[in-house]
Amino acid sequence: MTLNGKELAAVLKAGHAMVQADGKVEESELKVLFGELANFGVPAEQAQLMMVAADAMEASEMFETLTNLSTEAKKYVAGYLAAIMISDNDIDDSEVNMWKLICTLSKFPTMNLNEALTFWRNN
């Protein structure tokens, strides 16, 4: 799957929101958050610059960008966000609510967590 810089920044911003959803930033969540950047070809030394770009993006721009992704990309992002959520082995209600909010406002296909994770792992 290929994403342009703006799309990747939107995905990273959504991922960062997932990391912060329960009020605790866990190392395991950051590992998934930044590990995905490597899968998209972003060198480790540029990860922080990408995070700065993501943080500078307005939420409305993030949602607009995510809404315009292909259906396959939306499923992938839903799984990626779910992977961040489960990475610390402690699924908090606030994380589930954040995942549902992002998926709804971004018009992602209806999926449960397990379906989203399975799609992400297989793609």
Task: Kindly give the residue locations of the regions a language model identified.
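Small-residue-enriched hydrophobic alpha-helices in membranes
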Residues: 1-123
